[in-house]
């Protein structure tokens, strides 16, 4: 199935049902009074993370999603049915963003997690609610409020512990094949990898973590060169980045310039991502003699002013890959646990929360101000004819 990691959809929660104006009409019961019921609440729209989904392609072609409207109230104090909630299944790792305000509504990072993205309208009140000592036959009701409408931008961010960075043909896909059972396409031309790939690494029995390989970056990617930087977002949740450097490029380019270009594009995209722990990994060590390899690696480290971890491997020959995979596991385990700030029932702010109380208070205030002793002449009263 085609990998789609972005989609824009429109969600509409259901409107609340309106209240009913009705009076009790029953034999032998004079002056039955009001019996209009309330309407039902409108259905809300939720996103739910499902591990059985791995792409947003369904929402690329189906963009409009509406929850059910609440039913209107009826006589005999019958309340209308509430509208059914609409639950949209999305892959684990999906982020919901308000397309108009760019507000991040939430991240769905665990299976079964739900996020409320559009709240259904509040139900209207029937005339029974407005009965009082000064208004015995009310003909007032309130309408249901509109459901919330949002344009959502859905972004799928891969959940991985380790992310791979590097120029095209640096050997990232070969490395992920060497340390996991993933089988991304490998060839001797640039941009072989067109979509992100995930692999599960098992460095020792009972140990595992996930590694993500994204398409290669080139200088100017922030301006749209190559495949751009749109896939860098998949590294945002990684706990450590591996910067794969081709120590002996076939086109004769300087590894120092290539490394600086990658760091520059990373900083342009996100300073936060650029500040993540990052290790330098010199690949294709099998193409050079040991002394020449050491000399080149030391020159790159010196010119970059690099003070972090440095490793030399041959992904093709799998030299040093097993040791690197084990050290990555040890490093990940040494990090503090990630903050779990996502609330499975996270709700968005809704403007109608105090709607009913405000309406009732306002109407009762009007009656208290205008009430006089002559009930029949009250401005708010109505003529009611009861039949026996």
From Swiss-Prot:
Its EC number is 3.6.5.-. Keywords: Cytoplasm, GTP-binding, Hydrolase, Magnesium, Metal-binding, Nucleotide-binding. Residues 1-159 form the Obg domain. It comes from the Bacteria. Pfam families: GTP1_OBG (PF01018), MMR_HSR1 (PF01926). One of its GO terms (cellular component) is cytoplasm. InterPro entries: G_OBG, GTP-bd, GTP-bd_Obg/CgtA, GTP1-OBG_CS, GTP1_OBG_dom, GTP1_OBG_dom_sf, OBG_GTPase, P-loop_NTPase. Mg(2+) binds at residues 173, 193. Its cofactor is Mg(2+). The keyword Hydrolase applies. Coiled coil: none annotated. One of its GO terms (biological process) is ribosome biogenesis. NCBIfam families: Obg_CgtA, PRK12297.1, PRK12299.1. Monomer. Belongs to the TRAFAC class OBG-HflX-like GTPase superfamily. OBG GTPase family. An essential GTPase which binds GTP, GDP and possibly (p)ppGpp with moderate affinity, with high nucleotide exchange rates and a fairly low GTP hydrolysis rate. Plays a role in control of the cell cycle, stress response, ribosome biogenesis and in those bacteria that undergo differentiation, in morphogenesis control. This is GTPase Obg. It comes from Shewanella oneidensis (strain ATCC 700550 / JCM 31522 / CIP 106686 / LMG 19005 / NCIMB 14063 / MR-1).
